Amino acid sequence: MTSPQKIPIDLKMMIKDTKQDMDDVHQALEKLRSLSQEERTEAEVLRSRIDEQSTLICILKRRADEMLLRCQALEKINAELENLRANVQVELENERKKSELLEQRFMDLASNHRELINFKNEYKSQNAKLEKENERLRKENEALFSEEVQEKEETILKLTQELKDLAEQHKILENEYQEKTTGFQIKLKELMNLHRIKEASLKNELSDTQKQLKTAVEMCAELDLKLRQTQVKESMRETDTQERLEKLIKEKDELIDLSVQRGKIIRDKQVEIQELERKRQEAENGRRHAEDRFEKEAAAVNSELRVKELREALERAEFSCNELKKEFEAFKKHSCELLEKEKELNCKLRHMII
C-alpha cells in the first residue's frame, strides 16, 4: 500500500520538473529579447503560445495524476473488500464444522446413556437371581441346621438389607444422572441453536459485504464519469483542482488507517476464536477421559465404590459443562462487541466513500 509520505515527495518532484521546464522557457525568451523588433514581435507571439501550452500541459499532468491516485485508492478498497468476503466465507465454514461436531458428540452421549440403562437392567436381573438363590439356600439350611442357620440367616438378612439400600442409592443416583443428562442435552441443543444463529449472522454479513463491493464498483464508475466532466468544466480552475487533490489525499490516508485497524481487529478476533475452540476441546477431552475411565473401572469395583465413582463422574461432568457454558457466554459477548465495532467501521467507511 502506498505510504502517506510518498505522495508529497512525488508532488515536490513534479513541481521541481515543472520549474525546470519554465526556467528553460524563460532562458529561451531572454534570447528572443535580444533580437530585432520584427523578431521580437514573432518572439512575443511564440512566447505567448509557449506559455499557453506549458500552462495547459501542467493542468493536464495534474489532472492525470489526480485520476491515477483515485483509481489506485478504489482498486485497493475493492481488494480489501474481496479479502474480507473470503475471510467471512472461511469463518462460516468453520462454524458449520463446529455444529456438525456438536451433533456427533450428542449422539455419542445418547449411546452412552443407552449402555448405562442396559447395565442397570442387567444388574437388577442378577440381583433378582441372587435373591432367589439366597432364598433357596436359606430353606435348605433351615432343614439341615437350626441355630447356625438362624445366625447365618440374620447375617443374610443384614446383607440383603444393605444390598437393598445400595440398590435404592443406585436408583437415586441413576435418576440424578438422567436429570443431569437431560439438562446437558438441553444445553447442547441451546449451543446448536446459537451456532445456527451465528451462521445466519455470518451469511447476512457476507451478503452485506457483497452489497458493499457492488456499491464500491458503481461508485468507481460514477467517480470516473464525474472526473471526465470535471476535466471539461474546470479546465481553467487550477487553484480549486489543487485543493481537491489535497482533500482526496487526506481522505485516502484516512481510508488506509481505517483499513489497517479493521484488519487488525479481524486478526484478533480469529485468534480469540481459535483459543476458545482449544479450551472447549480440552474440556471435551477431559469429559471423555472421565467417561472412559468410568467404563473401564466399573467392572473391577464393588457396589459402594461404583456409587462413589458415579457421583464423582457426575460432578466432573457438571463442572466441565458449566465451564464450557461460561466460555461460550464470554465468546458470545466478545463476538457481539466485535460485530458492533465492525458495523461502526463499515458505516464510517461508507460515509468516507460517499
Curated annotation (Swiss-Prot):
Q: Which residues form a coiled coil?
A: 10-334
Localisation per UniProt entry: Cytoplasm; Nucleus
Q: Is this entry keyworded Nucleus?
A: yes
Q: Which domain of life is it from?
A: Eukaryota
What are the record's GO terms for cellular component?
cytoplasm; nucleus
- For whether the record's keyword set contains Cytoplasm, the answer is yes
Q: Which InterPro entries match?
A: CCDC89-like
Q: What keywords appear on the UniProt entry?
A: Coiled coil, Cytoplasm, Nucleus
Predominantly, its location class is cytoplasm
PANTHER family cross-referenced by the UniProt entry = COILED-COIL DOMAIN CONTAINING 89, COILED-COIL DOMAIN-CONTAINING PROTEIN 89
Q: What is the annotated quaternary arrangement, including any partners? A: Interacts with hey1.
Family stated for the protein in its record? Belongs to the CCDC89 family.
Name of the protein in its database record: Coiled-coil domain-containing protein 89
